[in-house]
């Protein structure tokens, strides 16, 4: 009986934990900081005009960050706002920000005092990744492009109360103040 019970437990364990989730997520991040010179915005330039369909933003530990998007104006002497402030809501997962605009440059401006973005992936009208020609200016925001999944599934995000466990563990590990005190890491 013991052998049968152990065998079934092992079999169930292997089935239950197989493909539970991804073991890789963006590790480095760019910090937008209001009041810091050049840190409130990211200004991206492309080799040529490109239709930006979406920005895929992987947020750090703080949720509900707000960003406004700008493109160069027709005269080339300023910037035009192309969106109302966009709320990027979820931590530790990819958030889609619709853009649908053809441009050679794009400015992303944070509306918050601090916003940590672990990675930004820019997708064109065909869903292909577009790396800005000045990505090296913001290396923490563009250094882990390969982690963006070709197909979105549950494996690439935290769900239900996993959000609290993962977030609390991250905060403890990095010496940050803890957001949720009722869930252990």
Task: Describe each region flagged by the PLM.
Residues 1-33, 43, 49-56, 63-65, ...:
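Membrane-integral, polyisoprenol-dependent glycosyltransferases
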Residues 43-46, 90-98:
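Exposed aromatic-hydrophobic patches
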Residues 49, 61, 85-87:
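Soluble non-transmembrane domains of integral membrane proteins
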Residues 79-91:
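Solvent-exposed serine/threonine-rich low-complexity stretches and specific carbohydrate-binding patches
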